[in-house]
Amino acid sequence: MGKLSYQSIRREMAWGMASEACCYVYYPEDENDLLEIFELAKARGITVGFRGAGQSYGDASLNGEQILVDLSGWNRILDWDPENGLITVQSGVTIAQLWRRVVSSGW
């Protein structure tokens, strides 16, 4: 699971660099990793916070001394229907990725 173990804590900055927190950071590769992270959090009595692309000015993803799940690697556009303007993406997709995909279709 993940690239950092539970014993590793790391200082994370919000994208706007106005706030920071020390978190146990995990980079899940699949849904099974997510289940394992939730089981770990439940066993330890700690909370889980999520970060998508990590480019929000807010600091909602910071989860001080708790688990931070970094989903920036989950950055695929799964489906795009230009006729209806509906797009399905993973949580790490950026606005720039969305624009590159939809603007050429007139959206």
Q: What is the role of each PLM region?
A:
Residues M1-E12:
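Conserved oxyanion/phosphate-binding beta-strand-loop segments in alpha/beta enzyme cores
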